[in-house]
């Protein structure tokens, strides 16, 4: 490994490190962000969802543009956009600016994630050196995923929530310098053309759906605004499907979904990310807003999830090579559902049960992600593997975005329906009760200060904070039950239709990914799920 190769490895590894660091670091800062901008559950959902939404709508187009116009160029664009977005997040004067800046971070993250490994692969043409380089590259990225929650908690406790974004600035500057000076350009001369119409329709469809789901509990599911957005999403999706089926260079080749195994693998991976990212959002809020933990302690509490994914992931490939993909997928889904059920029934009990539940969720995710990738990539012809991998990447981001939106909205809807009636005995005055319920819901915090609204002498029978905490816990339980139910559906579908004989060698799978999309076989967007060892025959 010469000096240029080493610096290329550092530049690409640090870029991915930043992307993975931001996957979970924001969650522990949400209560502080809420207090700064006085926003409710919907505002917090936008802060976390806008990042994954930016990745979801742009990741496939970013890969095409990188293949067409140069991966180094688009890596620089991605890092620059991500770094500028981080600056804007840190300086944000309002929740709207913060949400927009998070979306810009997501767009930059999409470009970085689909170009990073391709640049490493181009810098190390010899097979053994390439394998060693990818191992180092994944190790650098893994550090970011496993330390994200803990580092985020420490930064928030010491310097406030804005510091979690400023930490990206020195790294971004270093990555830009190293890339400009040492990373060589590469591209794909056979790349397909950029599908602008498909990209725009995809943005409209996904964006309108996410907007309707997040804002629905606040503005009403039957409001004109919500109905218009739902219709916009439906029409946009229909037009997208119609256009992509007729395009000679589609952004998303929908004919791949004719294969039952591939379609089910995509549905499964989307559902896993839906459940897990929604769970992480709700668990973080529970630990800080209900249990009253500091950001630092919350970050440590989340660590078992990331650690379990990082530890189990490298071991799963060997298991797939020996017994196939079906059993690990189903076992992983069962373990993930068990972890969610443990979280559902652990709120009033010890923190140890929460830690065990998070560890089970992480182990379940790690156990099923690699075999899902195996099923998906062996179900398609080798010449279409890049497209298949890109769709899988987009569905991961879409799943996490919808998870933030749907499960957060379930909590908000539950509170809107139950909190005020449950406060009736504690706060008999209807005006005070309504105002108090609105404050608690809008602050997304059952510990919101109530003294100025309801004087202590007007409180009867029970403390409103205790009632609000119980409603928050019940709302989180309902949301996690929704996540568990969706996993149960894909588990039953997988039991029926997942193939029983998928044993794919790493060399065979790696040969299927010749484009910038190769990043998907080494890096999952799940925090902590970074690996480089492909399974043996």
UniProtKB/Swiss-Prot annotation:
The gene is stp. InterPro entries: EmrB-like, MFS, MFS_dom, MFS_trans_sf, Sugar_transporter_CS. This is Multidrug resistance protein Stp. Belongs to the major facilitator superfamily. EmrB family. The keyword Transferase does not apply. GO terms for molecular function: transmembrane transporter activity. GO terms for cellular component: plasma membrane. GO terms for biological process: response to antibiotic. Keywords: Antibiotic resistance, Cell membrane, Membrane, Transmembrane, Transmembrane helix, Transport. It is a multi-pass membrane protein. It holds the Pfam family MFS_1. It is found in: Cell membrane. It comes from Mycobacterium tuberculosis (strain CDC 1551 / Oshkosh).
């Amino acid at each position: 490994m010469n000096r240029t190769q080493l610096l290329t490895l550092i530049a690409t590894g640090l870029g991915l490190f930043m992307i993975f660091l931001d996957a979970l670091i924001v969650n522990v800062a949400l209560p502080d962000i809420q207090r700064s901008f006085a926003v409710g559950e919907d505002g917090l959902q936008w802060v976390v969802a806008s990042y994954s939404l930016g990745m979801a709508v742009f990741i496939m187009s970013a890969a095409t543009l990188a293949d067409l116009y140069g991966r180094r160029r688009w890596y620089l664009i991605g890092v620059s956009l991500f770094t500028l977005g981080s600056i804007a997040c840190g300086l944000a004067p309002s929740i709207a600016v913060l949400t927009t800046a998070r979306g810009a971070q997501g767009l930059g993250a999409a470009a970085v994630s689909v170009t990073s490994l391709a640049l490493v692969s181009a810098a190390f043409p010899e097979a053994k050196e390439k394998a060693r380089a990818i191992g180092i590259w994944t190790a650098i990225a893994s550090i970011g995923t496993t330390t994200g929650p803990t580092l985020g908690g420490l930064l928030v406790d010491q310097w406030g929530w804005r510091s979690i974004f400023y930490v990206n600035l020195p790294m971004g500057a270093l990555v830009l310098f190293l890339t400009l000076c040492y990373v060589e350009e590469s591209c794909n001369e056979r790349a397909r053309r950029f599908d602008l119409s498909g990209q725009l329709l995809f943005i409209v469809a996904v964006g309108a759906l996410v907007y309707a789901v997040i804002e629905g509990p606040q503005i009403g599911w039957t409001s004109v605004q919500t109905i218009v957005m739902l219709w916009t999403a439906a029409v946009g999706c229909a037009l997208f499907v119609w256009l992509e089926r007729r395009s000679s260079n589609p952004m998303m080749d929908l004919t791949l979904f004719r294969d039952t195994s591939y379609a089910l693998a995509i549905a499964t991976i989307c559902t896993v990310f839906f459940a897990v990212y929604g769970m992480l959002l709700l668990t973080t809020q529970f630990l800080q807003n209900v249990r009253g933990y500091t950001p630092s302690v919350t970050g440590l509490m989340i660590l078992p999830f990331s650690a379990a994914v990082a530890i189990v992931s490298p071991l799963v490939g060997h298991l797939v090579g020996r017994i196939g993909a079906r059993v690990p997928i189903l076992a992983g889904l069962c373990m993930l559902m068990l972890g969610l059920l443990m979280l559902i029934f652990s709120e009033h009990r010890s923190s140890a049960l929460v830690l065990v539940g998070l560890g089970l969720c992480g182990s379940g995710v790690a156990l099923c992600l690699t075999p899902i990738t195996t099923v998906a990539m062996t179900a398609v012809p080798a010449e279409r593997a890049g497209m298949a991998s890109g769709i899988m990447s987009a569905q991961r981001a879409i799943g996490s975005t919808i998870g933030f939106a749907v499960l957060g909205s379930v909590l908000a809807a539950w509170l809107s329906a139950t909190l005020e009636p449950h406060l009736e005995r504690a706060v008999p005055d209807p005006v005070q009760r309504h105002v108090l319920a609105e404050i608690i819901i809008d602050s997304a915090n059952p510990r919101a200060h109530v003294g100025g609204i309801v004087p202590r002498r007007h409180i009867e029978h029970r403390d409103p904070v205790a009632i609000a905490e119980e409603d928050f816990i019940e709302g989180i339980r309902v949301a996690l039950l929704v996540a568990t139910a969706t996993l149960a559906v894909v588990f039953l579908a997988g039991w029926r239709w997942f193939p029983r004989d998928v044993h794919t060698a790493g060399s065979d799978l790696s040969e299927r990914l010749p484009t910038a999309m190769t990043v998907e076989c080494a890096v999952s967007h799940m925090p902590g799920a970074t690996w480089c060892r492909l399974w043996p025959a």
